[in-house]
Amino acid sequence: LVQTEEYAKRFIELGADAEKVYIVGNIKYDAVTTEVDFRKRNRLRTSLDIPSDGKIIVFGSLRDGDEKVAKKIWDELKEKYSDLWFILAPRHPDKKDIILNHFDSKDVLLRSENLKGKKNQGERIIIVDTLGELIQFYSIATVAIIGGTWFPGVDGHNPLEPAGLGVVPIFGPYMRNFQEPADRLLKDNGAIQLSDYNELSSILERLFASPYESINYGTRARKIILQNQGAVLKTINFLARCISK
């Protein structure tokens, strides 16, 4: 059982019987959330005092060095867009202090404090120092930036999570751990890959200036996810046939 035609070709080239190589797809697609209830999305926006027409950048799974990328983006865009909110979700919530050190505290609201009742007092940077909420934040995003992709060493995080929710994922050159889904999204124009984080602000400005472009990217991204789901069922059916023989 293999994920793609490319993998099938490789096994056959190595000597496998072509009639015994089956393409079932990538089970990672089956685990992707493709819808979050609009009431949950509205409650999340309301809890953070983000208007329905606010521009939201979600920078997910930040790793070492990504906080500098986030700071650069914020410094370049905060004055240009008064309706911009920047949501930063570190891969490890206990690293929030590293992020905090790069921003003015008066601009930052911690999600943990927000959940305890602290209201937004005009902060436009939200640090998600909680677990299990990234998908919800992706669901209200205008665009998503994938952490761990801008510097060598981590080799990427999952671009399928925002893609499944119709949000365009933007990632850097280091995607080895998620190369297949990244390539598939890029092939069908459902994601944006940049060679350098210095390009981020300009691409974000382009997407903000043309909302339909980001919407179309997101629509294509979600379609790619839906088209590639079903690998788990194919695998189970194949194994069931093998067992019954």
Predicted regions located by residue number:
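Nucleotide-activated sugar donor-binding and catalytic core shared by glycosyltransferases
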Residues: 1-245
